[in-house]
Amino acid sequence: MKVTDAGFFRSLVRLADDGWRMGWHERNGGNLSFRLTEEELRSAEEELRPGAWVPLGFSVPELAGTAFAVTGTGRYFRDAAVKPEDTFGLIGLDGRGENYRILWGFAHGGRPTSELPTHLLTHAVKASLPGEPRRVVYHAHPSNIIALTFVLPLSDEVFTRELWEMFPECPLVFPEGVGVAPWMVPGGRAIAEATGDLMKRYNIVVWAHHGVFCAGEDPDAAFGLMHTVEKSAEILMKVLAVPGGKKQTVAPEQLRRLSEECGVDLPERFLRDKPGQNP
């Protein structure tokens, strides 16, 4: 089977194209990766042409021998559907998780996204956690959530609570909350480690003044996380733009009732009363 005909690949192309159509991927903004199963990799093996090993510059032994579909550095999500072999590539890690090699794609001399450290450290974290594996890591630049990082305190508790209050799906879609990382130089080990640490607790990490990382079980789930958190941020931005701000909102006790009736666990630290608000 051709790589571009494989189900996992078509789902990635759709995610990239949908994200671009939402306006989340200006120019070459954003990146995407999918941790492949052995079966998924075998389905496309007739087209695999392993290249030379390239040092990662760090070690992820938890992912030794694993293959990934990844967007390329400098590539445009706008081109995902029309130039998939150029936009994406498949890479494989060696038996120590210290080197990678290109297996397919990245036409015209391309290479993996510059945010590969953050993707791999996030995948390493998610692969080690119990439950259904979150194999898709998605980074985008949604305008409203970025705008909020200029006006809200850069706090997990503040962002989570404000976003949960906007509409009921938010605490149901991301009941564990939202992590917030301060502004850091993108593409480096420091921001990768900070994101990986937050991904131990969250599936959505906001990069202040930059964008969002989401980790989902599949491309649909990853897109759904990004879509939900950005819609909530859009509503909040509109509320904050109204003179006088909020006149009423969802109270902690209402969120607790939602938690009980829908069977989700909302951490109590996000439900503490805000100044001037009665439960």
What are these regions (language model features)?
Residues 1-279:
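Glycine-rich flexible loops
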